[in-house]
Amino acid sequence: MSLRFIYGRAGSGKSQFCIESINTRIEKGGDKPLILIVPEQFSFQSEKNILDLIGEKSINRVKVISFKRLAYRIFDEVGGIAREHMNSSGKSMLFYHIMNTLKSEFRVFALSARQKGFVNTIADTVSEFKKYELTTEVLRDTIDEIEDEELKNKLHDLSLIYDEFNRLLYKNYIDPDDDLTILKDKIKQSTVLQGAEIWLDEFSSFIPQQYGIIEELLKKCSRVNITLTMDYDNASKDNDIFSVTQNTEKRLLKLAENNNISIEKPINLNGRPFYRFKNSPELSFLEKNLYSFPYEIYKKGPDKIEIFKTSNLYTEVEKIARNIIEFVREDNVRFSDIAVVTGDLGSYEKTVSVIFKEYRIPFFIDRNKDIEDNTLIILIKSIIDIFVKNWSYETVFRYLKTGFADIEPDEIDILENYVLAAGIKGKKKWTEEEWTYNVYGDALEGDISEESKEKLSKVNEIKNRFLRPILNFRERVLRRNNVAEICRALFEFLYDINVPEAVEKMVNEFRESGRQILANEYSQIWNIIIELMDQLVEVMGNEKVNLEQFSRILFIGIKEHKMGLIPSSLDQVLVGSIDRLKSHAIKILYIIGVNDGVFPSAAMEEGILSDRDREILNSKGVELAKDTKTQAMEQRFLVYTAITNSKEYLFLSYPIADYEGKTLRPSLIVNRVKTLFPKIVEKSDVIKIENDEESMKLISATVPTFNEMISSFRKEIDGEGEVSSIWHDVYRWYSKSDEWTGKCNNMFKAISYTNQVDYISEEKALKLYGGSLKMSVSRLEKYIECPFSYYVQYGLNIKDRKIFSLTPPDLGSFMHKVIDRFCETIKEENIDWNEVNDHICEEKIYKIVDQEIEGRGGSILNSSPRYSYIALRLKRILKRTVRIVAEQFKRGSFKPVGYEVSFENGGSYPPITVGLNDGSEVVLTGRIDRIDMMEKDGSTYIRIVDYKSGNKIFKLSDVYYGFDIQLLLYLNAILENENLDEEDKVLPGAILYFTMDDPIIKGKNNLTDEQIREEIMKSLKMKGLLLSDPDVIKEMDREMEGSSIIIPASIKKDGTLGRSSAATKEQFDILIEHVRNLVVKNCENLLMGDIRIKPYKKGKEKPCDYCMYSSICRFDTMFDGNNYRYVKEKSDEEVWKLIEREMSEEGDERGED
């Protein structure tokens, strides 16, 4: 029985020495076992290395195992485990249960127990206790010796948890963390190990459990060989980096001494050329000097070491992919000879996956996969969340879109569109016998068409099919209220919807399509779920819980579970984390993300027990895991072992920015390598160089090369430089390929693509809009704002997905309807506006609003308390509106003669007809809220009032550009169509906007009711354009003194007009003429097919800000031909001068005097 150390720095050949020693023992003969113990992640590669050397001879004599697998072998021989292991998921669920049970007894963990992730922190701490052989008895004894009150309280709580965990666990299970502790005692009984020779390789340190096993092996076996990555004499220039293994050596020597184990002369592999670096002196030099002080300088320019700086993570991985293709293609390297590692696999995993697939590089990402994103797990979470979250939209459709429900994808779309439009959410609405909500009119419309009824029938059929298994599950759960019963109900539900058969079908489909990793994942997932629930039932099956509590416990376990993945082939690039880098024959090593805080990683969090806590416990003889300072030293050692892992080539790369554009700094390792190799040239893609040589480097796999070709041609077209002739050769290759010919044709279409559409043919325009153009005035205004937006909305009839909500147009429509009904009511009841008071306003408005809501079965305004409040708010606004309207009538002589006046065939007035220059006509329709009239001195004055739910501001400048032409067109139509006696004169009185609102008045607290009323009227003053006749203006507000509080006008003391928004009769005439010219011009453009993306921009105002079609047009001033139609805000004076000049020039053209 002896102990022998095998010393050697990284790459010295320690693993190879072990394998050759085993082979020597085999050749000498004998039957004693030869056992190589390695960390779990190295076992496969080590076994392969041994097979490569010794073949299949005496293979039964050699065992390559980890400590865990050694435990299982000994248990198989001598017994020791009569119960099943509880996995990490089961333990997390158990800890959660314990934390909830004991929370009233905690001294410090009561609040922390609720924090996300705290259960896992507790689980890790208890696992640490077991690995470091800290029993509950020792923990309790230690508490009495601790003076630090905070630590004493922590240990008190941990002791409670630890005790309860062991008590509950050992009823039916055993903790995998106890295996090595049990193994230590069972080795004594083993005959398999008697006289065996052991080699321990690839360990830098051991935990107490492992030291205990090594101690027993030393007593049992003929020899124990242990490799240590360090110098032989402990006097090297970089002892600091080997402090971890030096401490391991000291502890092993002490252990041998305590057991009277002889120490053999060690093997020193540092004195000969390093095995790994026999073909690479540069890498050998790097290994010797990476952490040496003082250090040497490599005088030549290195060929086997490269540093690359990239713009971002994406271009970094692209560079590596091209480099890998080059090695495989030109240097006869196998993919399995290559490894790509990083200190931050999470940030790179998806990018590597996407780019390597594009470059057709076979790869295996070495990591344990979370199962949370598996479709079956999402299904289970969704079905529970449907009830926990009261049938929310998100949970229901997350369930449906897993693909396990008996609903086809197009049926899910139908159901989803209806649910969004009708605002279906909550158990009550989902479980209604039949849905009858109208989703095809506006949000406040209640009538249902025949077409709507047919669609509703289909929606209800889909809904009922979805509900059947869901409601069955609900009934089962309602009858069961403990963990075991809920688990049983959940399994019954999964069988009801045929999940096992569906999963099996998915596995077969994945295998047939070559997606082996997904096939492996889904072939495991069903058994994982069964195991999870079995453990949950065994541990706390009789616990009474509701669904929410059950879900929380179950998904704590699910989050903890990791699924091991198996490589689908041998010839793959290994992609992984530096701490799992397997020591196999890596010829080419890429270390990516060599950034500060990543390589080496930043300091780890202290956890529940701080560094100070660990120091105190250590002083009491309690050994625990390393503090953060020691962990930092281990990180340095990890960097050393990673960077020296390659046999032939080392590539270090780092991005200067992350995915969000935030600056990243290079690691100190980069600067260290530059210092050791002063002639190394750091390459970069930050500043791209365009020449034939660089272009050649971009030619790799077909897909990325094609993309690079497109990029090069695009740059040439954009005037960013001449394309290399190489890309013309590349194009010729692709164009001759049957697979790529079509793509080449599409490429030039894409390169020359512009989102600008200019014109469609007049023929298409006629088909879209009809031979004689008929449209509403508001639509014409939309066309003037942006032709393309009009084309998409009214030509193509593209509509946004309807969502159950109350939009401003919905509110405006509803308010107009109520105002119209109020006006008709007082007219029918012969109530004069002068008699309308607060009581009448409130009584009738409230009644009309209630009737409108009740008469619309699916009205949004009675769908929830929130919308009921909006309805109440609408009542107040509308009451205030009609009260102000009444006050306006009382103060003036104008009287209403029409409400909701329409301009259309069969309407109050005929449609507005405008002749175009080619002899055709455009027919404009529309509706105005109110027309008022007043007769004075033999003339009739017309006042048009339009109600607005938003704060509409009248600007003459907007009329000039065509953005606000409705009121003038309606006024013109009325003036032309009024049937009055020939001697009477019909004149424009005003065009006005009136805002419907219930404003909040800011002012002093001692305002009288009359003052408040006046302030409200000022706030709701009508805006628009008046006839500049003081007598007519006074008839609109007989009480005005100076400035009016109801119209935009003021009268001076001498009776003349002061500051007012007014125009003469002649100005009204030329303004109307200007508007009619705008109609002609824009309608002709429309019929000519002008659908250009040409939005206007006035200052900061532009229609794109509220346009729902921006994702279609993708307007961007960076694109060629994408320009705003800039319009300048003009003063009223400027507008009048421009219009008068235009009318004068037009008259000159017609030869008028």
UniProtKB/Swiss-Prot annotation:
Which Pfam families did the record assign? ADDB_N (PF21445), PDDEXK_1 (PF12705), UvrD_C (PF13361)
Q: Where does [4Fe-4S] cluster bind?
A: C786, C1104, C1107, C1113
Is RNA-binding one of the keywords UniProt gives this record?
no
A GO biological process of this protein is: double-strand break repair via homologous recombination
Positions bound to ATP: G8, R9, A10, G11, S12, G13, K14, S15
The cross-references to InterPro entries, in alphabetical order and at most eight, read: ADDB_N, DNA_helicase_suAddB, DNA_helicase_UvrD-like_C, P-loop_NTPase, PDDEXK-like_dom_sf, PDDEXK_AddAB-type
Keywords (A to Z) from UniProt = 4Fe-4S, ATP-binding, DNA damage, DNA repair, DNA-binding, Exonuclease, Helicase, Hydrolase, Iron, Iron-sulfur, Metal-binding, Nuclease, Nucleotide-binding
Quote one Gene Ontology molecular function term: double-stranded DNA binding
Q: What is its EC number?
A: 3.1.-.-
Report which residue ranges the record marks as coiled coil: none
Q: What does this protein's record comment on cofactor binding?
A: Binds 1 [4Fe-4S] cluster.
Role according to the record: The heterodimer acts as both an ATP-dependent DNA helicase and an ATP-dependent, dual-direction single-stranded exonuclease. Recognizes the chi site generating a DNA molecule suitable for the initiation of homologous recombination. The AddB subunit has 5' -> 3' nuclease activity but not helicase activity.
The record's section on NCBIfam families has: addB_Gpos
* Note, other: Despite having conserved helicase domains, this subunit does not have helicase activity.
Its name, as the record gives it, is ATP-dependent helicase/deoxyribonuclease subunit B
Q: Which gene encodes it?
A: addB
